[in-house]
From Swiss-Prot:
Pfam families, sorted: PCMT
Region (AdoMet binding motif): 85-94, 160-164, 181-191
Covalent lipidation (N-myristoyl glycine), chain numbering: 2
Gene Ontology CC terms: cytoplasm
Residues of the active site: 64
Protein name, as recorded: Protein-L-isoaspartate O-methyltransferase domain-containing protein 2
Subcellular location, record wording: Cytoplasm
Similarity comment: family membership: Belongs to the methyltransferase superfamily. L-isoaspartyl/D-aspartyl protein methyltransferase family.
Biased composition (Basic and acidic residues): 314-328
InterPro entries noted in UniProt: PCMT, SAM-dependent_MTases_sf
Gene: Pcmtd2
Signal peptide: none
The keyword Lipoprotein is assigned to this record: yes
Region called BC-box, residue ranges: 240-250
Amino acid sequence: MGGAVSAGEDNDELIDNLKEAQYIRTDLVEQAFRAIDRADYYLEEFKENAYKDLAWKHGNIHLSAPCIYSEVMEALDLQPGLSFLNLGSGTGYLSSMVGLILGPFGVNHGVELHSDVTEYAKQKLDVFIRTSDSFDKFDFCEPSFVTGNCLEIAPDCCQYDRVYCGAGVQKEHEEYMKNLLKVGGILVMPLEEKLTKITRTGPSAWETKKILAVSFAPLVQPCRSESGQSRLVQLPPPAVRSLQDLARLAIRGSIKRAMRQEATRGGGLKNTPMFKRRRVRRRRMETIVFLDKEVFASRISNPSDDTSCEDAEEDRREVAERTLQETKPEPPVNFLRQRVLRLPLPDPLKYYLLYYREK
C-alpha cells in the first residue's frame, strides 16, 4: 500500500506532502509526525526509502505506508490522557507518535507477535528517549511492548479508549476486537480489505465507517501448545506514577510554562549567531628609496608576494564557507535542558529531571 503522495527529501517534506494531499488534517497529528523521523525506524541500509509513501518490510520488521499511518492517526481522534492498545505494534513508530499526544497520564500498550521485533522496538524507543530533539518538547507517554499473539489476550484484561490493529482482520474476529473497547472508544483496523473505524456508542451499540481500501497481511492464527492450551498474552497493568516521577513532571511543566510566557513577552532565549574571527593578511608594501636626493617609489619584492595565489584561494574558501553557513540551519537549542542545568540543584537531580538524556 502507499504511493498516494510524492516522496520527500526529508521527514518534513514528506509531512508537507501528506498535508497537501489531506491525509494529515489536524495540528496534533502533524506535530507528532514531524517530531519523530520515520527514517529512524529503518535499518541503516534502507533509509534512502524512508520518505517514500510506501510500506517497507525486511524479515519480520514492517512499516506501513505514511498515508496509512496518517489516516489511522486521524481516525483514532487521540486526546491527552486516553488509553491506547496497538495490536501488531511492530517497530514502535506508531506507538511513539501516539505517546506524544497521550501525554504523561495516558496508557500506551503494544502487542507484537515476533520477539525480535519487540526488541527492535524497545531499542528504537530507548534511542528516541535518549537522543531525540523532540522529546523535551512534549510530555511523553512511553509505550510498553509485550510479545504474543493479539488474538490470545487474556480475557480479564482492561479495556481501552483507542485500539488499532495493524493486520488484516477477518469477520470472525470482529467481535473479539470490539470487546477490547470501552464505551465511547474507537477501534481502527483493516476489516475485509477496508480500513474501518468502529466507535462503541453503548454496551452493545456500534457505529462503523469505512475509510479507504487497503491491503494488509492477515492476522496470524494462534498456535496451540502441546497440551492444547492457548498461550494467553498478559498486558501490562496500568502503571501508577510515583511521587518522585510526578514531581519531575511538575518541575518540567513549570519550566516550560515560564519559557512560553517569556517567549510571549519577547524575552525568550534566542540562538546567538556565531562570528568567525577575521584573518589578518600581510599585504605588499610600496618602498621609498632615496638616491642622491632623488626619490624613487619602487615596489620591492616581499616574501608575501609569493603567497598571493594562496591568499586568493583562501578568499575563495572563506566565501564558500560563509555561503554554506548562511544556507545551513542552525542546530536546535534545547532551552529546557539549559534551564534545568542552571537550577541550584545537585547534578544527580538535574540529570533525573532530564531523564538522563544525552542532549
